[in-house]
């Protein structure tokens, strides 16, 4: 029994009798990138495992049981045993041939190394780097040369500390080499540091199945998983390799919580985990919520307070106006007249019922020559009028002589469908008497224009005074057909040139002819003879008639 006791309860290892080396600050395993020599920049400094953004630390060793002079060599070896010399190199101050070597300070036993960087080599330079390690005797564990050939993990290295001190007799004494934790290249996804950068949501139902988008640093789609841990519970998110987008994004669904009937939110940890080396990222908080059987949040939408409902009703287009309608905006319009002077009201012009009341002394003597009057009357356009069929007086002798002197061919119109004759226009009332009179009285001429019209002639034989004009005849012309006496006939269109001719020549008006019978042929104006008969007024050629008048 006494012989088995040491086997069951082994004794504590005895402390070394001499000095030994201890690593009190390990190098940071992840987060550092190995630099190529062709990059032309410093490889950086290897940080310590407790290094932060505000407090920087570096790999540190302590020589226990010894204080005095000594040397230290730091080299790179492979991660897995046998720990062969690594083709990568250490660069920095006091570095040569791929390793670091310097004298130790005799006054202290703790030594820190701040200027150490890792420089990687290309695969094509791998054999040359291994041969250089053999030539410089950089082989801390004395691995045979035959075993140094083979594959190397270029994404992970270890630091090997070799310390040489002096024994009491002054001879050099090599202490056993010490290896650090592996240091991984942050550029390689299979060894890089795992880090969750961002998620689109950090809570979900306790039943699971919520889709989450996760952004991260480079990962390998075949060597990554989303790990959930809680008190006495762990689970993994559900996704496939196709859900890993370009090694930096993962779309997964949350696993169900251990207790699907929980009544209060539960906080758990969510991490990235690499199964190959069981490396974990920094945890991120995730919250499981109780299941309310309301996946579409209908109950939450129904929770409307009175004030909320009231505000909604105020904004509703179907609700009545709550505030009185604002008064319309008044726009200032500039007035054309002065505000101080009132605008005079329009006054009707007092027209007289007869020309006998006109003071002729107010008007200058004006008589038109016969040539200009006939030419002006021919050029003045007149609207076509429908002439009623009524007995007309015989043509004036002056007009008949004018027509005989300049005969014009009358075109014969082709027979056409008879057109309806418009009914006779109603006679104007007394109120319309002043229309033409006002137009005549308002005529204004300049001296030059009037002189050009009259031909600048003052011969009394040519011009006749207006005093010799018969007022009754002029009144009949202005009234446009209103008879002065009941026994006089209604004047027609052709009486105007006749009256003007009489004004120019000074001749008296001939007596009115006897009224023609109702069945008498010819037009009412008396221009056509008895043998010229038209079945309708539409058969008459007005253009030929006007050309005769103008000639």
From Swiss-Prot:
A motif (Nuclear localization signal) lies at residues 301-304. Residues 309-348, 506-530 are annotated as: Disordered. Ubiquitinated by RNF182, leading to its proteasomal degradation. Degradation is required for termination of NF-kappa-B response. Polyubiquitinated via 'Lys-29'-linked ubiquitin; leading to lysosomal degradation. The modification Phosphothreonine is found at residues 254, 435, 505. GO terms for biological process: animal organ morphogenesis; antiviral innate immune response; canonical NF-kappaB signal transduction; cellular defense response; cellular response to angiotensin; cellular response to hepatocyte growth factor stimulus; cellular response to hydrogen peroxide; cellular response to interleukin-1. Coiled coil: none annotated. InterPro entries: Ig-like_fold, Ig_E-set, IPT_dom, IPT_NFkappaB, NFkB/Dor, p53-like_TF_DNA-bd_sf, RelA_RHD_N, RHD_CS. The modification S-nitrosocysteine is found at residue 38. The modification (Microbial infection) Phosphoserine is found at residue 75. Keywords: Acetylation, Activator, Chromosomal rearrangement, Cytoplasm, Disease variant, DNA-binding, Host-virus interaction, Isopeptide bond, Methylation, Nucleus, Phosphoprotein, S-nitrosylation, Transcription, Transcription regulation, Ubl conjugation. NF-kappa-B is a pleiotropic transcription factor present in almost all cell types and is the endpoint of a series of signal transduction events that are initiated by a vast array of stimuli related to many biological processes such as inflammation, immunity, differentiation, cell growth, tumorigenesis and apoptosis. NF-kappa-B is a homo- or heterodimeric complex formed by the Rel-like domain-containing proteins RELA/p65, RELB, NFKB1/p105, NFKB1/p50, REL and NFKB2/p52. The heterodimeric RELA-NFKB1 complex appears to be most abundant one. It is linked to A chromosomal aberration involving ZFTA is found in more than two-thirds of supratentorial ependymomas. Translocation with ZFTA produces a ZFTA-RELA fusion protein. ZFTA-RELA translocations are potent oncogenes that probably transform neural stem cells by driving an aberrant NF-kappa-B transcription program. This is Transcription factor p65. It comes from Homo sapiens (Human). The lineage of its organism: Eukaryota, Metazoa, Chordata, Craniata, Vertebrata.
